[in-house]
Design a protein with these regions (language model features):
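Extracellular-facing segments of soluble proteins and assemblies that are Gly/Ser/Thr-biased and enriched
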Residues: 110-192
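...with weaker cross-activation on analogous glycine-rich loops/strands in unrelated enzymes
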Residues: 168-225
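C-terminal motif of bacterial Sec signal peptides marking the signal peptidase cleavage site
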Residues: 15-18
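Cationic-aromatic interfacial patches
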Residues: 22-110, 119
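Positively charged n-region of N-terminal signal peptides that target proteins for export
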Residues: 1-4
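Low-complexity, Gly/Ser/Thr/Pro-rich intrinsically disordered linker/tail segments
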Residues: 227-230, 234-279
Length: 279
């Protein structure tokens, strides 16, 4: 009888995390709803500068493309200047174990993810947006809706005047535990067409029971207006943010042309209707 009570208690305490509902880590040997591909393209390294230590300095541009110029206070400037680990660094899970490259990613963003299994896919997207706002001291703008009631939990209410980084990180883990792909999907407005994509936009699928989210961390255009983007993700179990390779076009990888009917990434398949933006 005691074991039954314990089981009921455990089930009632499930928390919701970024990639799924509830927060159940995927086994290491299982990929959820993977993108399908007949063959894995070789690592595209023609656009990789191994000495670069930010997204902008490491990922080179294809001929004819230019990055937009962002003001220092813009989200785009924050994202393309995200710090990276050395080129040979592999992704670490929250527990210190390593996620093999398997041609999934080419670079790892140098940001701490904590010691709990919380920093998953939508969490990483929310975290980057929050980190940008925190850096700009726009504390009142840091807020995310919870899955339970679709109401925002604000950083200012949580911090109560204490805007130190430890308090900020506690707030983020609070959000990670009770917001996920479903809540973020419903919170953000849709983008009408992928041709209108902006840096910082995110592809989100709510999923049933598991969803996924990735974020546009860089963008470039050519003289005709054609747009290419870099995509980044975290995943399950909680792991460091990684810049994704493009299995569909090894001559363009890691850049993506998302003006397609289907956007296949190494671990998930998205569609134009999944593109969301920040208000």
């Amino acid at each position: 009888m005691r074991s039954i009570y314990v089981l009921i208690a455990l089930l009632s305490c499930q928390v919701f995390s970024g990639c799924g509902q509830p927060n159940v880590a995927a086994p290491n040997n299982k990929t959820l709803n993977p993108a399908t591909t007949e063959s894995i393209a070789p690592d595209g390294n023609q656009f990789i500068n191994p000495d670069g230590m930010t997204i902008k300095s490491r990922i080179l541009l294809p001929e004819g493309f230019k990055r937009p110029t962002y003001r220092v206070e813009e989200f785009g400037n924050f994202l393309e200047n995200l710090p990276l680990y050395p080129i040979d660094q592999e992704v670490h899970y929250y527990n210190g174990k390593i996620k093999p490259r398997n041609n999934i990613y080419n670079s790892v963003v140098k940001l701490d993810i904590g010691k709990r299994d919380l920093h998953q896919c939508a969490d990483a997207v929310m975290r980057l947006r929050a980190d940008y706002l925190y850096q700009q001291k726009r504390y009142k703008d840091i807020k995310f809706n919870f899955l339970s009631d679709s109401k925002p939990r604000t950083y200012t209410s949580y911090a109560k005047g204490n805007y130190s980084y430890p308090t900020y990180w506690k707030y983020l883990e609070y959000v990670f535990a009770y917001a996920n792909t479903a809540s973020l999907h419903d919170e953000l407005p849709s983008v009408k067409t992928t041709q209108e994509v902006k840096i910082g936009d995110t592809f989100i699928q709510k999923g049933s029971p598991i969803g996924h989210a990735i974020i546009v961390v860089d963008l470039a255009k050519d003289s005709t207006g054609k747009t290419i983007v870099l995509l980044a993700q975290s995943y399950m179990p909680a792991q460091e943010i990684q810049i994704l390779n493009n299995w569909n076009n090894s001559t363009l990888s890691p850049w993506y042309d998302i003006d397609q009917d289907i956007i296949k990434t190494p671990e998930w398949t998205f569609y134009p209707k999944n593109l969301k933006t920040w208000e």
